[in-house]
Amino acid sequence: MKEYAFGIDLGGTTAKVGLFTTSGALLEKWEVPTDTSNAGEHILENLADAIHAKMAEKEITSEQVEGVGIGVPGPVLDSRVVPIICANLGGWGERNVSAQLSGLLDGMKVLVGNDANVAALGEIWMGTAKGCRSAVMVTLGTGVGGGVIVNGKVIDGAHGAGGEIGHITVNRHETAACGCGKHGCLEQYSSATGVVRCMKKLLDENPDADCVLRGKDFEAKDVFDAARSGDALAAREVDEMTDTLGMALATIANTTDPEMFLIGGGVARAGDVLFDPLVEHFKTYAFKSCRETPIKAASLGNDAGIYGAVRLIVEE
């Protein structure tokens, strides 16, 4: 094993890049703007330039670098983005990211994974789930992302769509469409935007109910804060949200039986007001032998992606 490795978490606005030792020590991290012009044609060139510049700065040679891991916001199969457009990367279509980036890096080894799966891999390597062989990570942000690790390996699936937890159907009677085009996806209820949408719906359906959020612009954090303070309508929304999420996690537990669930993203910062009812609802729906599966907050935060990307390289 060589001395260094690079990890990249590619997002629509910036790419987070980390220089690591191959034992997992983060030496330095920085960001590279994501150039989405011309259908994202310059994204990989810019990343290669950034890595070359850092190697020159640190006097690191190619012979000292084990490789580069990269998490991308789209389905990945066999180190290749499958033919689904990544809209937040300027409309990236099918491309062999591994081969293209490797070519720009003078033949350096490059491995690619879905960003949510890679973040889960980071948590199981150096985060909350360190020491676990199997874990499921659910990220509650603008959407709901997911990563499934079984026996230390990312489950990409036959079509690169493994871990699309946010698009589990939890309400077949929903009339509003999810961003994916389906109806009744978990993301519509348990993401930050979903919590706000459902809270607004509750306010409309209960015009006479007192609520500190009525008549205000609010975010998901405000809903959880109101519930913590004893607001009955906000508490009802949190109960419904955690019931839906608990049912989805129980479905996953009943099929993959992980050692641990990890909850990340901005919503996870709600703390006990989220986790306490979530655990109780999960136990209601889970198969008996899975009911005590721990549900914990992820710990690596925004660095999970770069840790997991490096893990792709060093576990090879």
Question: Where do the PLM segments sit?
Answer:
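Short hydrophobic alpha-helix segments
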Residues: W30-V32, A87, A158
